[in-house]
Swiss-Prot record:
Protein name: Putative membrane protein insertion efficiency factor
Pfam families found in the cross-reference section: YidD
One cellular component (GO) term of this entry: plasma membrane
InterPro entries listed in its UniProt record: Membr_insert_effic_factor_YidD
Function summary: Could be involved in insertion of integral membrane proteins into the membrane.
PANTHER family: MEMBRANE PROTEIN INSERTION EFFICIENCY FACTOR-RELATED (PTHR33383:SF1)
Main location class: membrane
Family membership: Belongs to the UPF0161 family.
Location in or out of the cell: Cell membrane
Membrane-topology descriptor: Peripheral membrane protein
Transmembrane region(s): none
Amino acid sequence: MKQILLLIIRGYQKFISPMFPPSCRYYPTCSNYSLQAIKRFGAIKGGLMGVARILRCHPFVRGGYDPVPDNFSLKRNQKNSKPRN
């Protein structure tokens, strides 16, 4: 399951994402965040973290640096978050 999710995200990054202008408000991008979360926490927890991150990525949020936390959480990583310039 983990490998399937990683393959889907990499496919999105390679074939779908390049067709649109960059729009992610966070660094790392939502797809990279999802890859890292799934690798670190597995398909279920990492997948949930990726979905939560995508739901947070909208025009009404400041965005900024939001790395995958050391411990499982569906909230933004406030410890290291700084607005993007």
